[in-house]
Design a protein with these regions (language model features):
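Short alpha-helical transmembrane segments in multi-pass integral membrane proteins
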Residues: 1-19, 76-143, 191-245, 300-365, ...
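Short runs within selected transmembrane alpha-helices of multi-pass transporters and secretion channels
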Residues: 69, 73, 138-156, 164-172, ...
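Small-residue-rich hydrophobic transmembrane alpha-helices
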Residues: 48-111, 145-164, 274-332, 336-338, ...
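Helix-terminus/linker motif at the lipid-water interface of multi-pass membrane proteins
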Residues: 27, 31-49, 118-125, 181-192, ...
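Hydrophobic transmembrane alpha-helices of multi-pass small-molecule transporters
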Residues: 60-63, 175-180, 209-213, 284-287, ...
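Structural signal for membrane-spanning alpha-helices in multi-pass inner-membrane proteins
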Residues: 110, 153, 179, 183, ...
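N-terminal transmembrane alpha-helices
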Residues: 6-38, 42-43, 59-71, 75, ...
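Transmembrane helical elements of multi-pass membrane transporters/channels
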Residues: 17-36, 137, 148, 171, ...
């Protein structure tokens, strides 16, 4: 049985076997994000800026999809560790129901608020029109992202991460192939411009979701996801969101931060475009760490449910080391090749002049971020996702945006980028405090009788 692997395989080998396929697939996705923006930049800078300004809503969609899936994954892995397989099936079905409901909500939102959303961020009419076209398509036809994420987490929860790699990579590769064809009208296709970029995105997501569903039906024998006779279970949905909601808030706060930064940077013209380019580039660094987390969460959750304290502790230590190591590589690359990275997006010298100090300064926060990202997922795996939420709110809303706004008053855009390292340092301190707290309250008591835990706490 797959659960035995998560309870017995050597930790290093287990983390790699669980995480590497997801990391590879997320790297492919990150490559898609970069390639997609490179193709869009060939239309003009206004189109690239529009895609950058659309990011907060797209990020919010991903926040709801991934955050819900995090709750499903952690709850499901813990239930499988407890050997309650019937309950695991019910959890999986309720997760699928939530994914469909989430899509319907965003389809309505995309149809109604796209124009006022862009009007609030820019006065440039060309940027607005590009943005409305792009975002409306991504929202109204965005069911794929919700179902893809849910079906992939069902595979991850039972240790079948290789199929997740296949689905994510296939979806991203389809995106990459279709982007130039639909944007520029190759091979007899109509020239769709920025609408082509949106269509390529949603089509790739739908294909990936379909593949993930097929893999679950064909190979995921631990779970029965048939919806025949299904009725929503409010209690289980509540348990999913007990872990998932803080994760949603954590990522949604990121969307709000991006929107706030776009408003702050609006006074500096092309700085909005630079900020968008940075986010595309940083995804290539952050995505492998997120992939590491996706492999780590079910390992910790399973061994927590199975009361294997030593394996929980070693998984945390090794994951932190891997996460920080990955971020150090990203820091080095952005300090050695900042101008070359900007030129990939057809950037003119004026844009490069803003972009180089931005990449060099913001990337200083990467090392701290590696620790904080991994530790945040540890909180979620142990059913304490609220700690991740507190850290995220404090970092982005209480530190980053206020500091960025304060520094913007100087009129020097290069100073604004320092808000990121400052905020990440605050996040490091708070994350460390919560990690010590959760170790004393939960981790060190794993395997003890319940009465002993209660007395200690």
């Amino acid at each position: 049985m797959q659960e035995n692997k998560m309870g017995t395989m050597p930790i290093d080998k287990l983390i790699i076997s669980m995480s590497l396929p997801i990391m590879i697939s997320m790297l492919v996705q990150a490559l898609y994000n970069i390639v997609d923006s490179i193709f869009v930049s060939r239309i003009n800078e206004y189109a690239l800026r529009a895609v950058s300004l659309a990011f907060p809503i797209q990020s919010l969609m991903i926040a709801v999809a991934v955050g819900t899936a995090v709750g499903i994954n952690a709850f499901l892995s813990r239930t499988l560790g407890e050997k309650d397989f019937e309950k695991a099936n019910i959890i999986a079905r309720n997760g699928i129901f939530i994914a469909i409901a989430s899509y319907i909500g965003f389809a309505v939102i995309g149809a109604l608020i796209s124009r006022p959303f862009f009007s609030s961020q820019t006065e440039v009419m060309e940027v607005r029109e590009y943005g409305v076209t792009y975002l409306t398509i991504c929202c109204v036809a965005g069911m794929g992202i919700f179902l893809q994420t849910t079906f992939e987490r069902l595979l991850q929860a039972t240790g079948k991460t290789i199929y997740t790699m296949i689905t994510q990579s296939t979806g991203a590769i389809i995106n990459i192939i279709l982007d130039p064809i639909l944007i520029f009208g190759y091979f007899g296709m109509p020239r769709m411009g920025i609408a082509g970029a949106a269509v390529a995105t949603v089509f790739g997501q739908i294909v990936a979701a379909s593949m993930a569903l097929w893999f679950n039906l064909k190979f995921n024998k631990e779970l029965d996801i048939s919806m025949k006779g299904f009725h929503p279970n409010g209690h289980l949905i509540g348990q999913i969101y007990k872990v998932g909601a803080p994760s949603i808030v954590v990522q949604a706060i990121g969307s709000l931060m991006t929107y706030g930064m776009n408003l702050i940077l609006a006074a500096f013209g092309s700085a909005q475009t630079v900020f968008g380019i940075y986010f595309k580039l940083q995804s290539f660094v952050f995505m492998p760490v997120f992939g590491l987390n996706n492999g780590m969460v079910p390992i910790i959750a399973y061994n927590y449910g199975a009361e294997h304290k030593d394996r929980v502790i070693r998984t945390i230590k090794h994951s932190v080391a891997y996460g920080v190591g990955i971020m150090c590589v990203g820091l080095i690359v952005m300090h050695i090749f900042p101008a070359q990275l900007m030129r990939m997006f057809d950037a003119e010298e004026s844009l490069i002049a803003i972009g180089v100090p931005a990449l060099e300064t913001i990337s200083l926060s990467f090392v701290f971020a590696g620790f904080c990202i991994v530790v945040g997922s540890v909180f979620q795996a142990l059913g304490n996702g609220v700690y991740s939420m507190i850290v995220s709110v404090a970092r982005q809303m209480c530190v980053l945006l206020p500091v960025a706004k304060l520094l913007s008053l100087s009129g020097e855009v290069t100073l604004i980028w320092w808000a990121f390292p400052i905020a990440e340092l605050a996040s490091l301190l708070l994350s460390t405090y919560f990690l010590v707290r959760i170790y004393k309250k939960i981790i060190c008591h794993i395997g003890e009788p319940v009465t002993t835990r209660e007395i200690t706490e």
